[in-house]
Design a protein with these regions (language model features):
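A short glycine-rich, Lys/Arg-flanked "PGG" loop and its adjoining helix->strand segment in the class I
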Residues: 47-62
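Conserved SAM-binding strand-loop segment of SAM-dependent methyltransferases
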Residues: 9-23
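C-terminal alpha-helical "lid/dimerization" subdomain adjacent to the S-adenosyl-L-methionine
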Residues: 66-121, 125, 131
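A short acidic, Gly/Pro-enriched loop at the edge of an enzyme's catalytic core
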Residues: 19-34
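Conserved H-loop
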Residues: 10-11, 27, 128
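Core SAM-dependent methyltransferase catalytic element
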Residues: 119, 123-147
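Conserved SAM-binding loop
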Residues: 1-2
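A short SAM/SAH-binding and catalytic strip from SAM-dependent methyltransferases
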Residues: 32-46, 69
Length: 147
């Protein structure tokens, strides 16, 4: 990522930080925006991680989360369930020694709150204007919220 920023001459404008969202010690009110792609469902404590990100955001700062979701429309829902129950684990056994990795993804998606519930959790933690948009036939959602 750092190399890409340098090539685009953005390395002085954008900084990349490595850390744990639940315990990150960045200063209060220090970030204009926080983006997370396919990571929030892996938080050990969802509300704690979201609250810590809220603490770090400046007033009016934006949170954008891209996360997998479970499609609700026929026939996408049925194909999705079939694929994750039968095809994904079979491919995992055929091509990988770590078959657990191929069962973890559908399990973690199933355990993650649905779109309305996750939006409610964002608001419970203290975010304002929490909303979501389904993308990819409902296979993922983009959540937006503001401090």
């Amino acid at each position: 990522g750092r190399e890409k920023l340098q090539k685009l001459n953005l390395d002085k404008t954008i900084t990349l930080q490595y850390g744990d969202a639940e315990t990150c010690d960045l200063a209060d009110n220090s970030m204009d925006a926080i983006t997370v792609g396919f990571g929030v469902r892996n938080f050990e404590n969802l509300e704690k991680g979201l609250a810590n990100m809220l603490r770090i955001l400046k007033p009016g700062g934006q949170l954008c989360v891209l996360e997998f979701s479970s499609p609700q429309q026929f026939p996408v829902k049925q194909f999705y369930k079939f694929h994750f129950k039968y095809i994904t684990p079979t491919l995992g056994r055929m091509f990988s020694k770590d078959t657990r990795a191929y069962t973890y993804l559908p399990e973690s998606i199933k355990a993650f709150p649905d779109n309305e519930r996750f939006t409610a959790i964002l608001e419970k933690v203290g975010y304002k204007k929490a909303s979501f948009s389904s993308v990819g036939l409902g296979l993922a959602a983009i959540y937006m919220a503001e401090k």
